[in-house]
Amino acid sequence: MHGWALDAYTRPNGRTQIGELINVIKYRLHNDPSLASIQAEVLLQILKRFLVRLFPISNRPFDCLMHPPSNTERQFHLTDFLANKLSSPSILNRSRELVKVRDHETVKIMSGKERVKKIPGSMQLIPNIDLPKPRGILLIDDVLDTGNTAKEACRAVEVVWPGTPRYYVSLTYLLDRGTSR
């Protein structure tokens, strides 16, 4: 798997534009989809610029987009918004095929040790049999903390589509991972 984070976000030492936008969208505007989508558009443009620089449209190694299953308590899901907006006839959003098969508390409140115990085995890929196996998958996430969610999503993909190249992009990662828990 190849992976990138567009930004480094740190709680005690400073905030970044991307980190602040994610925070506002996820925790203040999550139940106001119209306002959240306006803010999310900024993140979408940043992500598009990154992807075009890294993978020119004519040479994209993936034809599938996915994001880990979201917290269903929100009315607006940032990663779903991004995957839907990035999808096209040649790059399909197949996120609905990656499902949570075991519930656990919100990842944000779990310690690193709890994540290692609770996240593995919590996702399953149930492929749409009417669609071909993708030649490559771009996994999109909003915040990378311990990496356990990304690992679990990749594990679920590997079970069904072994050897399929995976590319992971997170909008931001926490520089102070694990120190606040």
Question: What kind of region is each of these model predictions?
Answer:
Residues 104-181:
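PRPP/pyrophosphate-binding module of the type I phosphoribosyltransferase fold
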Residues 66-70, 93-106:
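A short, structured active-site edge motif that brings together acidic residues
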Residues 69-79:
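Glycine-rich phosphate-binding loops at beta-strand->alpha-helix junctions
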Residues 28-29, 72-73, 144-147:
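Short acidic, S/G/P-rich loop/turn micro-motifs used as interaction or catalytic elements
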Residues 79-95:
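Glycine-rich phosphate-binding loop and adjoining helix at the ATP-binding site
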Residues 59-70, 137:
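Short glycine-rich phosphate-binding loop at a beta-alpha junction
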Residues 1-61, 100-133, 176:
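Active-site-facing substrate-recognition patch
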